[in-house]
Regions:
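Short, small-residue-biased leader/transition segments that mark boundaries at the very start
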Residues: 1-8
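Conserved amphipathic alpha-helical "coupling/scaffold" segments
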Residues: 9-160, 164, 269-272, 276-290
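Extended, charged coiled-coil "arm/hinge" scaffolds of SMC/Rad50-like chromosome-maintenance ATPases
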Residues: 135-151, 239-260
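Extended, Lys/Arg-enriched charged tracts that mediate electrostatic binding to polyanionic substrates
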Residues: 162-212
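SMC-family hinge/dimerization module
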Residues: 196, 200-231, 241, 302-326
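Non-transmembrane, heptad-repeat alpha-helical coiled-coil rod segments
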Residues: 248-282
Length: 404
């Protein structure tokens, strides 16, 4: 939070908009992968603590160096699991999708650790974060071997489930065998609408012509829209169908037991899982800062506390790099007031916005598009009053805006 009363006012908020920090943070957000990191990127605010700014710059430095060596780690499995874990801790049952999301987070945590451990080289400020990841392979494997997809629980999830499904297959084969004899029999050729085995309410039936209802004893489960076809469960298959329904009920109960057990396991590790989630989101944002630095061909500025700024070949980050004219700005040491004059559409506003935005960027922990030996100070407030709130992205000068 910026401490100055002036800087916490509407004027400061307006200055942030005028200097187009939100547009820059939108670009940063696009470099992040997880929704949480994207949201954090959009909410970044400049720090007024010089040590904090240097720490943030150290993080961006480390991420950019790692990206240069082996690319960014993947954060595609970083999904919000907080609500699901809170429900599991209350004794609730998580569904397969929620459990797979937790497993995906654990997989991502493990792979980020592997990324870090592959070639540690010299230590960085990110080491402590990488080292703190738990990477719970036990729970990850338990979930992924038990749940094949959002709609399918594996036979291997429990011996009981495998046994139930084996009996289910046997009962199903028995029912189909009985019905196959019926639809293959010449005796029922004129009785059946077609030689087909289908299901109604989970029970095997065959399509019987309505005017031949009495030819095949059994239970009617459905009637076609035209009324010409009855879907009949022959008496000979009732026992197999009953057995199948009982086994399906047992299967459902066993699946619920498995999901409850996996949910309880996840709840037992919730603290570590939530820690990993937060660390991964933080790393995602840090590597987004590194990626943005690469894209802008940016560099780390020297961080000062004396109120001076020294920019070498600075470029506005929202302008096309091929068209942007680099500028040098010195202020705060030999003199502390700088007046810029020049013709209309001559770049005065762009220069002022470049100065203000690059200072804001640095205090957000971002590298700035400027040359080596550039330096910025940590300010308690940066205020800007620029006519018409012209947009650099729209390349609209103050004079042109007035004419428009």
């Amino acid at each position: 939070d910026w401490s100055s009363d002036v800087c916490s006012s509407d004027l400061f908020e307006k200055s942030i908009r005028v200097l187009e920090l939100p547009q820059l943070l939108e670009r940063l957000s696009q470099k992040a992968v997880s929704e949480a990191a994207k949201e954090r990127a959009l909410r970044l605010t400049p720090s007024t603590d010089a040590d904090d700014v240097r720490r943030l710059q150290d993080e961006t430095d480390a991420a950019r160096a790692l990206i240069g060596l082996r690319g960014s780690p993947s954060f595609s499995g970083v999904k919000d699991v907080r609500e699901a874990l809170a429900r599991a801790e209350r004794g609730g049952m998580l569904n397969p999708r929620e459990l797979l999301t937790i497993a995906g987070l654990l997989t991502n945590s493990r792979r980020v650790r592997e990324y870090y451990e592959a070639d540690q080289g010299e230590g960085t400020v990110l080491d402590r974060m990488f080292d703190s990841l738990h990477a719970n392979r036990f729970l990850e494997d338990k979930i992924t071997t038990s749940i094949l997809s959002e709609d399918e629980i594996a036979d291997a999830a429990s011996p009981e489930l495998a046994d139930i499904r084996r009996h289910k297959r046997a009962a199903s084969a028995k029912g189909r065998q009985i019905l196959q004899k019926i639809i293959s029999s010449p005796s029922y050729k004129s009785t059946l609408q077609e030689a087909l085995i289908t299901q109604r309410d989970g029970r095997f039936v065959v399509p019987v012509k309505a005017d031949h209802r009495g030819d095949l004893p059994g239970l009617v489960h459905d009637i076609s829209a035209s009324g010409a076809t009855l879907f009949v469960e022959p008496m000979g298959v009732v026992q197999a169908n009953n057995e199948l329904k009982e086994l399906e009920a047992k299967e459902k109960k066993e699946i619920e037991r498995i999901l409850f057990a996996l949910s309880a396991e996840a709840a037992g590790f919730s603290e570590a899982i939530l820690w990993d989630y937060d660390i991964l989101v933080h790393l995602d944002l840090i590597f987004a800062r590194g990626e943005l630095s690469y894209q802008m061909d940016a560099a780390r500025p020297e961080i000062r506390t004396d109120g001076s700024v020294s920019l070498r070949r600075a470029r506005h980050p929202l302008l096309d790099p091929a068209k942007a004219v680099p500028i040098d700005i010195e202020v705060g040491r030999s003199f502390d007031t700088l007046v810029i004059t020049g013709p209309n559409t001559g770049g005065k506003t762009v220069s002022l916005k470049t100065l203000g935005l690059l200072c804001l960027m640095a205090q957000c922990g971002l590298h700035i598009p400027a040359g080596d030996r550039s330096a910025v100070s940590v300010f308690t407030g940066i205020l800007a009053d620029i006519g018409d709130e012209q947009s650099i992205e729209q390349s609209l000068s103050t004079f042109s805006a007035h004419m428009k």
